[in-house]
């Protein structure tokens, strides 16, 4: 896909801790049917070969629904499975390095908790930003919460899309009203849902 056409409205981040491989793939498919616009495969505890194997399986599903697949952390896995892009966090390789390795046509996303980090990521070639955690999250044991006012400041500081992440669901997303973000990233709201397709809608 053309990275200029990136749609981050509803951004699903996977979490294998809730699933067997079979149920994770089923959940991703149901979420794609429900309307997620981007899927990020996150496998913190898998080695390269296992990660790549799962990436190919997830990409087969996302391709079927024309949903771009983003690989968390691993540029090598993203390139090997020809994913749409990669997402790098603050402790991963620098955005500028990810951009150089991925080339000009792939998507590079970055995590930003401050305006300074957001501006730096943008200048280094990021296509979008993940900002948060807005609320406490079950995916990270220790997390520093990001104020909605900071999210708003980031949205005003850079011209690329910003996605709010962290403990968000249909019941609490009203706090984001007026922040100016382009989309919302969810993990447990879909990955733990009895009906992922319905929750994605």
Question: What residues fall within each predicted segment?
Answer:
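Internal alpha/beta core interface subdomains
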Residues: 179-183
């Amino acid at each position: 896909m053309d990275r200029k056409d990136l749609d981050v409205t509803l951004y699903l981040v996977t979490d294998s801790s809730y699933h067997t491989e079979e149920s994770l793939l089923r959940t991703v498919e149901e979420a794609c049917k429900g309307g997620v616009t981007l899927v990020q495969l996150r496998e913190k505890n898998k080695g390269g070969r296992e990660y790549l194997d799962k990436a190919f399986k997830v990409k087969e599903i996302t391709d079927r629904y024309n949903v771009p697949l983003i690989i968390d952390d691993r540029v090598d896995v993203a390139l090997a499975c020809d994913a749409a892009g990669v997402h790098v966090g603050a402790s991963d390789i620098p955005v500028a390095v990810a951009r150089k390795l991925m080339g000009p046509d792939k998507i590079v996303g970055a995590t930003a908790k401050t305006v300074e980090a957001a501006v730096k990521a943008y200048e280094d070639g990021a296509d979008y930003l993940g900002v948060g955690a807005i609320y406490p999250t079950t995916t990270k044991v220790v997390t520093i919460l990001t104020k909605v006012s900071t999210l708003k400041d980031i949205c005003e500081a850079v011209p690329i899309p910003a996605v709010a992440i962290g403990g968000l669901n249909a019941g609490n997303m009203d706090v984001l009203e007026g922040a100016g973000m382009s989309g919302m990233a969810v993990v447990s709201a879909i990955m733990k849902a009895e009906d992922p397709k319905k929750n994605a809608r």
